[in-house]
Amino acid sequence: MDLHEDQRLIQLLDERHDWPCVYSFKFIVPAGKGDELKALLPEAEQVDARPSSGGKYTAYTFHCPMGSGREVLGVYARVHGIDGLLSL
């Protein structure tokens, strides 16, 4: 993403959320990548996991306290390097 796109996303997040709040991040990762994902989100107050019916993937929801839209984008930047990760 470029700087303009980041600023637009931060503005949208800030318009739709009253910070600080608990923000829900949703990801799908290949089975076996959950620990890597969890290690990058130590601030999560709650983590929900649901394996796919075939067992190849796991869907995760992380409930994390966030103080701003910029913090939210920082989390997405942190997890971006995980192979096979889908952000929802």
How should these model regions be labeled?
Residues 1-59, 65-88:
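Long, contiguous binding/interaction regions
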